[in-house]
Amino acid sequence: MTTPTETYVDASGGDWDEVVAAAQRSQTDRLVINMGPQHPSTHGVLRLILTLDGETVTEARVGIGYLHTGIEKNMEYRTWTQGTTFVTRMDYLTPLFNETAYCLAVEKLLGITDQVPERANVIRVMMMELNRISSHFVAMATFGMELGATTVMTNGFREREMVLDIFEMVTGLRMNHAYIRPGGVAQDLPPGTVGKVRELLTEMPKRLKDMRKLLDANPIYLARTRDVAYLDVTGCLALGVTGPILRAAGLPWDLRKAKPYCGYENYEFDIPVSDGADVYARYRVRMAEIEQSLKIIEQCLDKLKPGPVMIEDPKIGWPAQLALGPDGMGNAPSHIAHIMGKGGSMEALIHHFKLVTEGFRVPPGQAYAAVESPKGELGCFAVSDGGPRPYRVHFRDPSFTNLQAVAAMCEGGTVADVIAAVASIDPVMGGVDR
């Protein structure tokens, strides 16, 4: 008789019997409800599948994918420079961080990280810190709206407008800028930008003080946020959670300090931390981060020395200062003369045409670059096969990773606490689904 070589498993019994027995012993009915994807208190098109035992959440699952746009796949059919117009639309509240992470990865592949002009790096840092401020204000505004505090919502969006006005002045758009490019930035700061930023530095501390008055000692806000959605350092590290959630649990991990990029090692700032590990602690960390961002921006203005804002290699860098003709159509003669060079070379114009239409070629290889976005570690993994287009680009979006913590934060709490928990994560579904 031949001994069976396969392993046979009895499908009955084991853990499943325990689950059935527990359900039979339960005196209450379990209710499964869908919160979202079109619920007024969820961030974007996020679907939460909650199992309730009365008011208590016994199981929380996250349903994503409702905002899938195929950005990563589409980038495989565009040039490396055109990729910035795609990545800026992922997490649409932090577009400049998306662009920077992508461009840092491309610059690593090209081997030009150290050739990016100093002025371009200072502008990148300043724009990112302004973006951090605007993102945190949206986080607090939407959180207030979801808890019914409409004054917090209106104030948060009002403060954000100050930042968006600067973005519009510099890039021409309030969102989806495509301003940061491989090798530098699209163009220099327009006249009046420094004065506009200094106005923000003067006014913003007063606005922050008003926001603190609304929330810091508000008994209703404290009741809804303290000891709610608790997640300690161990839980954060096990789930890969980064950003304000991790720092609110007591670990001062910030890529700007741990793995500096764009010259962050030359700036003086602190990493706000808390040991509360709850919703209230995350709010306090975000408020403190806004203050540190203002400190960094002030240093940026002092470091803004005259100079180029795009790498000088003509095979990579586009002309950084575009100008329209007097009729409002086409490029100005001065701009075309700049492209063609002093001798009016037709070859230079042809090269420029090929650079814009075909793009530059990137040597074969792989590179990963990460930045500290307002939500956490935002990483870009880029693969080149030596062509003018990416072979593969993949992003580690912090909202996607941090949403894994929903179950740990919500199970055992109440339905009302689910709203506070998700809002404290501050996910943006454009970055989650991509």
Swiss-Prot record:
Mind telling me which InterPro entries this protein's record contains?
A: NADH_Q_OxRdtase_suD, NADH_UbQ_OxRdtase_49kDa_CS, NDH1_su_D/H, NiFe-Hase_large
Q: What GO MF annotations does this protein's record show? A: NAD binding; NADH:ubiquinone reductase (non-electrogenic) activity; quinone binding
Asked whether the UniProt record includes Acetylation among its keywords, one would answer: no
Cellular compartments per GO CC: plasma membrane
Keywords attached to this entry = Cell membrane, Membrane, NAD, Quinone, Translocase, Transport
Q: Highest taxon of the source?
A: Bacteria
Q: What does this protein do?
A: NDH-1 shuttles electrons from NADH, via FMN and iron-sulfur (Fe-S) centers, to quinones in the respiratory chain. The immediate electron acceptor for the enzyme in this species is believed to be a menaquinone. Couples the redox reaction to proton translocation (for every two electrons transferred, four hydrogen ions are translocated across the cytoplasmic membrane), and thus conserves the redox energy in a proton gradient.
Which NCBIfam families does the protein's record reference?
A: NuoD (TIGR01962), PRK06075.1 (NF004739)
HAMAP family per UniProt = NDH1_NuoD (MF_01358)
Q: Its quaternary structure?
A: NDH-1 is composed of 14 different subunits. Subunits NuoB, C, D, E, F, and G constitute the peripheral sector of the complex.
Protein name (database record): NADH-quinone oxidoreductase subunit D
Q: Which gene encodes it?
A: nuoD
